Amino acid sequence: MNSSQHRPLGHARARRSAVARFAATLLPRRAGALALALLLALLLAGCGGVAEEGTGIQPSASVGTLEGLSDTSVSVNGVNYSRSAATTLSDGFGQAITADQLRLGMWLEVVGTVDETGNQGEAQTIRVRPASRGVVSASDGATLSITLFNSSVRLSGSTVLEGTPNAAALSVGDVVEVHGPQRNALGDVSASRVERLAVAAPVAPAFARHELRGRTSQLNPAAQTLLVGRRLVSYATAQVTLRRSLDNGQMVRVAATGAPPAAGTAWAVERLTSDLALPANLGFLYTEGYVDGLLAGPLFVLEDLPVDASTANGRSSVTANDQRVAVVGPLTQGTLKARSVALVTPGVPVVFTLSGPVTDYVSAASFKLRGVPIDASAATFVAPATAASLVDGVRLRIKGTVRGRGLAASQVELLP
């Protein structure tokens, strides 16, 4: 047990109360049983994840879908993290990006702190973690899936789309950027966001950078080749930046200006880097993903993050690979020591929150917020907001679910 065992009992109770409030707000879009499981786990946790003395501030990290976006904040896993001039924003390779590049549905890693209410946090770093960016080699509108870098990308009714009216319109040869968690070591992805960057042409469109994130296998040091997911890669001339010696089973990110050649021929990449940027030790982490490499305990991995759920609340629910789970607990020497594991129910709609000025106003059924098409014709307007108050320039906060490449608003509020 850490130094909190020497603190007064009243302080410990206050800390547990604060953590409980934090847990209660982690998953507002999830089923009640899931939120309750996380809440109970943190209520019972007596060690780890200790708030800073006397502040109610909980050091934390969240990995998941960008579900809320405003001029000064992002929301991930139900916590609204404020951004400031001190917040570092970067892409998967650690290159600086701007807040204007953030989009709903992106897969984010946020490291920062959360206050005792559990509703608000402060982001120290925000990293965008796309799964892949490249040319579609197969598309199946019936199953809502596409193939990229030989791996399957599965879309759903909650996948945020941009640049295409619907999933069925994605075609072989399109250049897309995909976000979402990987389902297995072969690099199959459950898409939280798909953006079409270029439309298919007789010749594959030129694009600045093709990128792939995946787990390594079949490493051949002599030939300097390996598989990333299902894609054969040559790193002979690549800039290599790794946290440890290259080996099988690592999560890496590769990129090159040129598109990959035909299957079976190694793709000569220009960059090869470790993907996992989380610190080895962290007081509290909330993440979602798909169970892989399941062993008794249960012990498993989420992408390449080892999870020890042997003492976690809800551990008996983890019975097979490819289950989507939510996990909370501290990171200890690179392993997530789960306080709680809970299944994420398939098909539960994701409620997104978007704030900003109205643009391109036509009617309550057709306007934009931060470039996203909005249909508020069936929304509840929170007074003093009304449908009549919708004009270009008025600032709104809307909540809604995905409909095509926009949002169907369920609630509309006016902002100052």
State where each predicted segment sits.
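Sec-dependent bacterial lipoprotein signal peptides
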Residues: M1-A45
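Short, flexible, surface-exposed loop segments at domain boundaries
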Residues: N2, H6, P28, L42-A85, ...
